[in-house]
Every structure is written in C-alpha cells, then in structure tokens.
C-alpha cells in the first residue's frame, strides 16, 4: 500500500508538470492568435490584456503573465505602426507634387537662362507658356516671362528662333483672334516690332501676367492715353502761350480728332491681314488731317492779329468746338459723296461691257453652229451625188468652187472670232 501511494504521489507532480507545459503551449498559441486579431481589429491592448491574479505563486504562472503582456505590447506597437503608415501615405502625394513642381520650375529656369544669355541669372523665371509665333509660317515654341524680360524660343526645321523683348520697351499688349473666330492670340508691340503669339491654351492668365510685368502700360489705356504722344508734345511746345481762347479750343478739337484717327489706325493695324483699301483709307485720313490743320492755321492767323481788340464771349468760345467738329464731319461727307458716284459710274460701265461681251460670244457661237450645219449638208449632198451617179465635170467644178468659197468664209470668220476673243480677254484683264 505504501508503495502504491508513493507511485501515485510521484505521478501527480508529473501530471502537474504536463498540465503546466500544455498551458504554456496553449498560452503561446493564444498569444500569437491575439496578436493577429489585434492587427486585424486594431483593438486596444487594455481590452485584450488579461487581469493577472494577484495570487500568482508559481514561477510558471509568472512566465505566462509576462508572455501575455509581451503579446499585448506587440499588438499595440503594430497598430501604432499601421496608423503612422496611413498618415505617411496620405502626406506623400502632396510632398511629391511639391517636389515635382519645384523641380520642373528649377529645370525651366535653368533652360531659360541657358537659352537667353542676355537675361541676368539673378532674375528668376516667373512662368512659361507653350504658344506659336505667327509669321510666314507658325513657329511653335515657348514664351518665357520674367520680371523684366519677355522671351520666345522656337526650333522648327532645325532653325532656332529667339526673341527677347525688354518689358519697358513694350508699347502695346492686346488680345486678338486668329481667322476672326478663335480668341487665342496676343499682340505684343514695341516701337519697332510687332509680334503675334497664337495657340495659347490659357490666354487670359498669360495676358494678366504680361500686364503685371509691363506695369507702365497700366496707367495708359490702349488708344486713349491721357498723356499725349511725342508729336503732340512737340506741337504743343512750339505753340505760343499767349493765344486767344477760341484758338486753344480749336486746337483741342484737333487733338480729339487726331486721337480718334489714331484709334482708327490702331484698329486697322490690329487686324491680321491688311488690304489695299485699308491702306488707301489710311492715306486719305492722313491727308485729311493735314488739310484740317492747314485750314485751322489759316483761320488762326487773323485771330492773332485781332486777339487784343475783340475778345470772344464764353458762350461762343464753348460753341466753337462743336462747330469745328461739324465742319470736319461735313468735309468727310462731301469727300465720300464725291467718291461714291465715281465708283458707281465705273461699276456700271464695267457691267455694260461684260454684258456686251457675253451677248457677242453667244451670237458668234450661234453663227459657227449654223455654218457647221451648212457644211454638213453640203458634204452629204456631194457624197450622195458621187455614189448615185457621176455628175458632170461642170457641176463638180461648181460644187468644188462653192466648197472652196465656204471654206474661205469659214476661215475668215474663225480669224474674226479669234480677234474678238483676244479683245475680250484684254478687256477682262483691264477690268480686274
């Protein structure tokens, strides 16, 4: 009995040790499963951490508790790593975009200073635009804008085209259209040159940037500048200051007329293609303004002599500008009314000539057709006589004579037709 009790007591600690080892293995597996579940569900470590019993006596239970705490700590660290990765992945596209934009801007700046050596390296590039320069052909390239320079570069068929315009030399920046339909072009004009840039994808932003660069154009609007031009300044400098009121008013009217003419001239120059009619109208306006100036000077001479004797009242002095404008408008209407009847008469004359030529061509065509029919009838008659019976020699000679006469008439008519055709062609060429 004592031996059996000793065997039972020996087997009990072995069983207890086996149970403890199985508990440790299950604890390890549960810890791994707990880590995976924490990765998926991202639970807090306090929710899954077991409450260790205060009454942990054996070292095995202490080991189990330490394993549970380690697994919970690992799960919490993995969850925090996941959150950090998510925040970094959200911030990455913004930083990448900033880096790419800064790198592209840096490359464009380097390319700009490499192309245009006249621009100082301390002056950075503001922005570049893809566009085309309109000349005899379209030169596709890029427009570079900096603080003090407007530059263009193009390489077409192996030919480099470089244009550098100082911002202070620009006198006009204007929006325009290509083919009178598509509003995608800009005009940049200086004192000596005029450039048209087309195929702009963002014309408004380009226009605003160019206006901001050329700040001296903001004070003066296009065509209506408050400051007079150099010609007007010189004209006013030569004019004496001791003039009567009516003389000053007349010249102020002339200044208004000159400004209006300048607007018309700029309107003609802004159009892409200039016709001979527009050039003639420019010459006409120039000569007309000169005549108005001469007339006003001729009228001003007697007023100088009588300036100190007779002073014009204020009401009359104010009414003089209106009279001067009405006189200029009357001169314009008279000249136009004189030109219009002449043009109408010329057009009517050309229309009559063309109608006469058309009628004569139809008549000549009719005559040729009738002669051809007569020739066909004669040849058919001759053939029938030859086949049916042998005609006498006298008749044959007469028929041959008639045929020769007809041939001569036909040749003479053909020569006349050729002469008429040549005359018609000359008239048409003169008419064109």
From Swiss-Prot:
One cellular-component annotation, GO: cytoplasmic microtubule
Chain intervals with Basic and acidic residues compositional bias: 9-39, 81-99
Keywords: Acetylation, Phosphoprotein
Annotated SMART domains: GRAM
PANTHER family: GRAM DOMAIN-CONTAINING PROTEIN 2B, GRAM DOMAIN-CONTAINING PROTEIN 2B-RELATED
Residues with PTM N-acetylmethionine: 1
A Pfam family per the record: GRAM
Name of the protein this chain belongs to: GRAM domain-containing protein 2B
Modification type Phosphoserine: residues: 225, 242, 252
Ranges of residues in domain GRAM: 110-177
GO terms assigned for molecular function: identical protein binding
Record field: compositional bias (Polar residues): 220-233, 268-278
Record bears the keyword Phosphoprotein: yes
Organism: Homo sapiens (Human)
InterPro entries found in the cross-reference section: GRAM (IPR004182), GRAM_domain_protein_2B (IPR052633), PH-like_dom_sf (IPR011993)
Highest taxon above the source species: Eukaryota
Stretches for region Disordered: 1-61, 74-106, 220-239, 262-285
């Amino acid at each position: 009995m004592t031996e059996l009790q000793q065997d039972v007591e020996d087997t009990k600690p072995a069983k207890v040790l086996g149970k403890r080892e199985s508990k440790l293995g299950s604890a390890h597996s549960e810890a791994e499963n707990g880590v995976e579940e924490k990765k998926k569900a991202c639970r807090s470590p306090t929710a899954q951490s077991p409450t260790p019993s205060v009454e942990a006596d054996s070292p095995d239970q202490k080991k189990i508790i330490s394993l549970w705490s380690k697994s919970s700590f690992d799960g919490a660290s993995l969850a925090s790593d996941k959150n950090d990765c998510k925040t970094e992945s959200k911030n990455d596209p913004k930083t990448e975009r900033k880096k790419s934009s800064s790198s592209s801007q840096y490359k464009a700046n380097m390319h700009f200073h490499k192309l245009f050596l006249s621009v100082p390296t301390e002056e950075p590039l503001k922005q570049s635009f893809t566009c085309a320069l309109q000349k005899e052909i379209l030169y596709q390239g890029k427009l570079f804008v900096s603080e003090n320079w407007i530059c263009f570069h193009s390489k077409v068929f192996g030919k480099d085209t470089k244009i550098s315009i100082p911002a202070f030399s620009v006198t006009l920046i204007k929006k325009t259209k290509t083919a009178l339909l598509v509003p995608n072009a800009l005009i940049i004009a200086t004192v000596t040159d005029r450039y048209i840039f087309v195929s702009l994808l963002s014309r408004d932003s380009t226009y605003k940037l160019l206006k901001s660069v050329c700040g001296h154009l903001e004070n003066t609007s296009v065509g209506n500048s408050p400051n007079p031009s150099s010609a007007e300044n010189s004209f006013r400098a030569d004019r004496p200051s001791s003039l009567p009121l009516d003389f000053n008013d007349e010249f102020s009217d002339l200044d208004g007329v000159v400004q209006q003419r300048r607007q018309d001239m700029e309107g003609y120059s802004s159009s892409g293609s200039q016709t001979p009619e527009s050039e003639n109208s420019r010459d006409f306006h120039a000569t007309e303004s000169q005549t108005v100036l001469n007339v006003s000077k001729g009228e001003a001479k007697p007023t100088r002599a009588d300036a100190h004797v007779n002073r014009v009242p204020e009401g009359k002095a104010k009414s003089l500008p209106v009279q001067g404008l009405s006189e200029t408008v009357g001169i314009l209407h008279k000249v136009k009314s004189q030109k219009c009847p002449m043009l109408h008469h010329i057009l009517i004359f050309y229309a009559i000539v063309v109608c006469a030529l058309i009628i004569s061509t139809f008549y000549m065509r009719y005559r040729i057709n009738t002669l051809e029919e007569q020739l066909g009838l004669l040849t058919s008659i001759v053939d029938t006589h030859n086949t049916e019976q042998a005609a006498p020699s006298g008749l044959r000679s007469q028929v041959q004579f008639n045929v020769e006469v007809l041939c001569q008439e036909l040749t003479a008519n053909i020569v006349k037709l050729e002469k008429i055709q040549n005359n018609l062609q000359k008239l048409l060429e003169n008419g064109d």
